[in-house]
Amino acid sequence: MDLISLGGGFNAGLRVDDLIICLLFFFFFLYAAQNKKTKVSKIEFYFILFLFVTFLGSLFSSTQYGRGTVLFPIRFFEYFVFFYMGFFLYKGGANIRKLLLLLLIANSAVAILQHFGVVGGFNVRGYQPNMSERVIGLTSGPWELGVILNFITCYFLAEEKSEFKKYIIFGVATLIIMMTGSRMSLLAQIAILVWYMKLSASLVTIIKRCLVVIPLLFAVYFFFGDSTVATRSDSLMNSDNIDLLLDSYSSVRITESVPSWGDLGVLSRGDEVDASWSMRGIKWIYAVKLYLSHPMYWMIGVGAGSFGNALDGGWLRITTETGIIGLLLFVMFLMRVKRLSPTMSLCVIAFCINMLMIDIYMSYKVMSMMLLLAGYYHKKRKDEKARLRENNGSEILFHNKREVL
């Protein structure tokens, strides 16, 4: 139940769990103050600036045009608390491998039961008894489950020592992603595998891995060739998708308040146009035209939350709602996260691909998981650097003593 509604067609407002997370941040802040930790990392610095620009754009749009809400940036602030949770998980010696393995097993088991119609699932509209067409596991939607499985795959590809276990986990995660019907998550799954194979091995090892992976991908396609992903993609590569988007641009008119997407309609109801593209296209046209209508929007956006629950295009949404400044700060934040470890490098690749067609940076579970992992690896890297400096200092001291003697 919402304590404060965000309005604008959002599925959730500010709830009790939001207050609990804010309380956790207060304890983290007290810990930092007690230990005199005043220096912030580049990751924190860029995200704080992103929050500031998001707040500024929302304040301007909400006061001048009644679009967006200044409460919306609170949700992004809340996500970042998970960064500090990850920090303390590593500090406390938590086994992140077991946690992610449990997450994979639990979601896979529920997803398989959903696929065969044994159980339903809780999505943004409450409990749904039949989720067999597009499974959601323990998440709020198939798009969330797909990205969560991408992240789990990233971890085990980068960290798991056993090649056999790596590809078993990759295979299981890919099968479940096929059941979700999420095309972006499937594309990300293939991309992170290719990137991992390219960076982590010699040519001979890459060839050996290809001999394992290619048959695995063919097996997945053979057994799930008529899956939801395949069915939804029948008209994806049709040139009519682009033609209709361009033809419809001039017919869309911007208004003072953003209309509901239902009022705007779709590009086409014909079978020759991809259904997902048809729904997204009309939203994207409106978002672009509104963004270009005022010079201030170019820099700080039309206001976070202006486009309601889903624009179905993360990169477009973050550009139009937070402007060029917000986009650049968010990209700089991601680049810093990418440098933390091989796992985070793969996670950022998966995240960026999913952002093409999904407002995934607004997803509670996805952002909390990515930032939790980022905080975990940030602390790990920090400790490793400290140990390296300590060891180097000890070696220098040892050599100096020998020279004196």
Question: Can you name each region flagged by the protein language model?
Answer:
Residues 1-34, 54-61, 349-353, 369:
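N-terminal signal-anchor transmembrane segment
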Residues 17-25, 71-84, 143-158, 183-196, ...:
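Hydrophobic core segments of transmembrane alpha-helices in multi-pass, intramembrane catalytic enzymes
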Residues 20-36, 150-159, 286-289, 298, ...:
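Hydrophobic, aromatic-rich transmembrane alpha-helices
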Residues 45-48, 164, 194-210, 315-355, ...:
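Hydrophobic transmembrane alpha-helices and their immediate junctions
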Residues 97-122, 138-199:
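Alpha-helical transmembrane segments of multi-pass inner-membrane proteins
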Residues 109, 115, 200-269, 290-293:
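A membrane-periplasm/extracellular boundary helix in multi-pass inner-membrane enzymes
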